[in-house]
Design a protein with these regions (language model features):
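Active-site nucleophile and cofactor-binding loops and adjacent substrate-binding regions
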Residues: 7, 77-79, 156-157
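Glycine-rich phosphate/nucleotide-binding loop
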Residues: 16-117
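Glycine-rich phosphate/diphosphate-binding loop of Rossmann-like nucleotide-binding domains
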Residues: 1-11
């Protein structure tokens, strides 16, 4: 294996990693820049709600969601569980359980292809059509479903539990 070290400033690196990601296999950086980089890259594939995370060292590995905790959403059954599900998929692959990992990946892909989406995934699939809410007022599930249908026709808004069930159903 050949390791090429390329030192660059953070703003230029963010541009390069988004424009030519295939030029980078390993990134070593400080925590703050790592947070910016991982969030920017997560946005390219669906956001932090779907991006898995792993910290792998010699003989030890930790797999976790890439986002922090969101105490304000605790117990509300509406946060995208994709990040932790895909972190589990990476863990299964790491320990050599490739067949189980393949089932998890198939389930996540199937749920998204069938448009069984948490609201954050609907925004990503809709692309630039997404309009940010004008206020921070709370919306009913029916209002959110109506907006979801406008963003992604044929989509079904699912809860945390609903997305997990959709993953299982699509395995």
């Amino acid at each position: 294996h050949v390791l090429t070290v390329k030192d660059c400033i953070a703003d230029n690196f963010l541009q390069q990693i988004i424009l030519v990601p295939e030029q980078h296999e390993v990134i070593a950086t400080l925590n703050l820049n790592g947070d910016y980089i991982s969030d920017a890259l997560a946005a390219q594939v669906g956001g932090i709600g779907i991006a898995p995370g792993a910290n792998i060292g010699k003989g030890i590995a930790v797999f976790e969601a890439t986002h922090g905790s969101a105490e304000s959403f605790a117990g509300k059954n509406r946060v995208n569980p994709g990040s932790i599900i895909l972190s589990g998929e990476m863990m299964l692959r790491y320990i050599g359980w490739d067949e189980a990992a393949d089932f998890v990946l198939k389930g996540v892909k199937g749920a998204i292809q069938k448009k069984q989406l948490t609201f954050d995934l609907a925004r990503v699939r809709a692309g630039r059509k997404f309009i940010r809410p004008k206020s921070k007022e709370k919306h009913t599930a029916e209002e959110i479903q109506k907006e979801l249908m406008a963003l992604v026709p044929g989509a079904t808004l699912v809860s945390t539990e609903g997305f997990g069930d959709a993953v299982i159903d699509n395995m």
